[in-house]
Amino acid sequence: MNGVMNGKNLRLVVLCPHFAPDMAPTGVVMTRIVHELAALGHELHVVTALPWYREHAIETGWGGRLWRVEKTAWGSITRVHPFPGKTKRNLLRRAFGFVLFSAVVGLRSLVAGGLPRRVDGVLAMSPPLTLGLTGWFTKLFRS
């Protein structure tokens, strides 16, 4: 992140499982990090899940599409389907959902903020562990 050292505003892609208004603990942390970076003047493009944490199901008013893109003053938020299962007890189903979610996040991260623009860095929140690998691939294609 040499841009921080020389005063340059950075262009970042942020991958995370939750973001406001989805207020899982990781959503609170990632929302704060993004807002703090935006306050410093950085351009951020968040790729996250549709809100689903509270009931382990996509919240009312958010369903119907595989992804949604919102423009913000500091960049954009792309929300993708989290593929939640009906129960948290089926570990195989949950693992499959995380892999599928990470794959869709990866595809959307390649175009977050527009094509074919380069980014200065990728910030990937884990868990799920699959988002780390997704972030690495995103950086390979976007740097």
Q: Which residues are covered by each model-predicted region?
A:
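Short helix-terminating capping/connector loops at secondary-structure junctions
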Residues: 7-8, 115-119
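Short glycine-/acidic-enriched loop or helix-start segments at secondary-structure transitions
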Residues: 24-25, 56-57, 89, 132-135
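Hydrophobic helix-cap positions at the C-terminus of alpha-helices
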Residues: 37, 112-113, 138
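An aromatic- and histidine-rich active-site surface loop
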Residues: 23, 94-109, 119-142
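Glycine-centered short loops/turns at secondary-structure junctions
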Residues: 41, 142-143
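N-terminal subdomain of nucleotide-sugar transferases
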Residues: 2-73
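Short, solvent-exposed loop/turn segments at secondary-structure junctions
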Residues: 19-20, 51-52, 84-85, 128-130
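A conserved catalytic-core segment of Leloir-type glycosyltransferases
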Residues: 48-112, 116
